[in-house]
């Protein structure tokens, strides 16, 4: 089912309501080694009933030798960026299942993460374990060809919650995204190192005796 949402036929995942998107661009789950949902096994809430909270429980079977552990200076820690994907991908699943995108069936809408807060309560070693995610779709507001939804998530492993938070996603038309200038106001921002002459840069060996003297060790 998750594979169909990522790369296959979304109708096979979400039902005949989504047959209208055959051959069209629509929201998809990340795939391949960045598909961080193994299964969805508990889903409550009726499609298009946005005045009621919809809930979902999903699981991710964390590979013991996943690429984000192998290529990590601290292989016992799941990188925060990956942890966020584990938390947020089921939010995308419940958003699609809710039918919000069907509010504007004639439009090709793009799904974007807008905001969020997360609290890391513990930092367990997740290698070879299963992470459970309890997600709530709290609100849905549609106006002017745009849809905004808010969620809460709670990640646990072996019965212990270790990461929880809230987030906001939105559906937008391509035209509205093209008109957004972003945090930089539309100005081109070049990397700091490109703005500074190389002859003014200093190479520091973090393991050298001189560097340790500089920082007072």
Residue ranges and their predicted role:
Residues 1-217:
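Acyl-thioester-processing domains in fatty-acid/polyketide/NRPS systems
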């Amino acid at each position: 089912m998750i594979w169909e949402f990522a790369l296959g036929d979304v109708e096979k995942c979400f039902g005949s309501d989504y047959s209208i998107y055959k051959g069209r661009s629509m929201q998809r789950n990340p795939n391949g080694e960045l598909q961080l949902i193994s299964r969805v096994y508990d889903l409550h809430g009726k499609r298009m009933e946005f005045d009621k909270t919809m809930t979902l429980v999903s699981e991710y079977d964390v590979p013991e030798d996943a690429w984000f552990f192998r290529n990590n200076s601290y292989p016992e820690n799941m990188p925060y960026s990956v942890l966020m994907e584990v938390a947020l991908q089921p939010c995308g699943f419940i958003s699609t299942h809710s039918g919000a995108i069907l509010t504007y069936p004639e439009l090709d809408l793009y799904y974007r993460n807008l905001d969020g807060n997360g609290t890391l309560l513990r930092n367990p070693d997740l290698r070879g374990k299963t992470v459970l995610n309890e997600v709530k779709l709290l609100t849905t507001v549609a106006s002017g060809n745009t849809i905004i939804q808010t969620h809460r998530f709670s990640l646990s492993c072996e019965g212990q919650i270790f990461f929880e938070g809230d987030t906001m996603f939105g559906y937008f038309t391509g035209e509205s995204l093209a008109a957004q200038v972003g945090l930089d106001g539309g100005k081109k921002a070049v990397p700091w190192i490109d703005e500074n002459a190389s002859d003014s840069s200093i190479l520091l060996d973090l393991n050298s005796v001189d560097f340790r003297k500089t920082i007072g060790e």
